[in-house]
Amino acid sequence: MRVKTGPTTRRRRKSWLKKAEGAWGINSTSYRNAKQTVMQASKYAYRDRKNKKRDFRKLWIARINAAIRKENYTYSAFMHKLKQKEIAINRKMLSELAIQNPEEFKKFVHSVMLK
């Protein structure tokens, strides 16, 4: 006797359509288009999880650079001094300090650069 796959197929297709719910137009109603849309979205999500790390690092560096240039120093010179003095503070923390407490950041920069 032949095994029919009606319920299985319906369940699988329903699953793809459920994942494509937020898609635009036919991409959320047609099974074939929904599947392609979801697969492409998954690729983008995977790629952008990697890019997110790069983007945040770039953002932190830009913020630190802007804050340091106000004190007439360069980012590269500042980072070099930090490494020389073996001060282990990451860029995320420096960036937050520059935004949240500009006065404290200013004191920190001068203490690193002048000693």
Swiss-Prot record:
InterPro entries: Ribosomal_bL20, RIBOSOMAL_L20_CS, Ribosomal_protein_bL20_C. Pfam families: Ribosomal_L20 (PF00453). The keyword Ribonucleoprotein applies. Gene3D superfamilies: 6.10.160.10, Ribosomal protein L20. Coiled coil: none annotated. PANTHER family: 39S RIBOSOMAL PROTEIN L20. Binds directly to 23S ribosomal RNA and is necessary for the in vitro assembly process of the 50S ribosomal subunit. It is not involved in the protein synthesizing functions of that subunit. This is Large ribosomal subunit protein bL20. It comes from Malacoplasma penetrans (strain HF-2) (Mycoplasma penetrans). The gene is rplT.
